[in-house]
């Protein structure tokens, strides 16, 4: 019986590590309803992107923020269709910080970015893509950041 309980707990913990948040699902649903058009400039990524008021900063209504806090490269691949189908003029991509924080290998992050680039090359070749490097995360103000984010300097360098 003890083994069954331990196995069940391990399975639940494993599933939780792959689970997306309610916030993620809500943002994905919202983005599926908001169209991307051919003259749009899309910012795609995680919380760094999500937190930016890009349309206001650039004073351009064609700038669309498609960042979702805590997003990972694999999850991002699952939500590309509405963006690719809109054939945006430009795409700015910043992803990978959260992948590295949960132990996803730099090679897997790079492979996911390559898959994204391949899809755009095939389905929206006129979209100009800017792949932004993963920003370094230091140990300053570690109480406000999960510790797994600020111990990944080597992985960030390798991924970039």
Feature annotation, model-predicted:
Residues 1-4:
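Positively charged n-region of N-terminal signal peptides that target proteins for export
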Residues 124-128:
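A short helix->loop->beta-strand "cap" motif at the edges of active sites that frequently abuts
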Residues 14-16:
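N-terminal signal peptide c-region/cleavage motif recognized by signal peptidases
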Residues 67-71, 92-100, 114, 134:
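Cell-envelope and extracellular/periplasmic
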